[in-house]
Amino acid sequence: VPTETVYGIGADATNNWAVKKIFHIKNRPFNNPIICHFENLEKVYEHAELNSTALKLAKAFWPGPLTLILKKRKVSKISPFVSNNIDMKGCRIPNHPIAIKILKNLNRPIAAPSANISTKLSSTSIEHMDNKLKKKRIYR
């Protein structure tokens, strides 16, 4: 999935199996949290608490490449695997039409790490993606 920064892979952030699959595909340790992408600020509110500072930053810089670390709401259905069972989440609203279209169609947050094998460079184009990652199946 393209974003305004790097290419990413994504899965339903509320689906434990899908989130664990991302860690497996990327060879990423579970103690390395994954950012969640949201369609809009209202969707962020459903899953995270924003204090006055976070709200000012969100309104000033979202959509865009700013990631805010926010406290997860108790009612949130985001998988605990996204952040290694910690109640804080990296949240972002991307500023790319394809990413937003996917988020609208799914109507859920997406666990969205960069499209690379863990510890390797992030890809800024589809051509630079690691071939090992391109060959891995994410879906069931």
Where are the model-predicted features located?
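Active-site-adjacent structural elements in enzyme catalytic cores
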Residues: 2-140
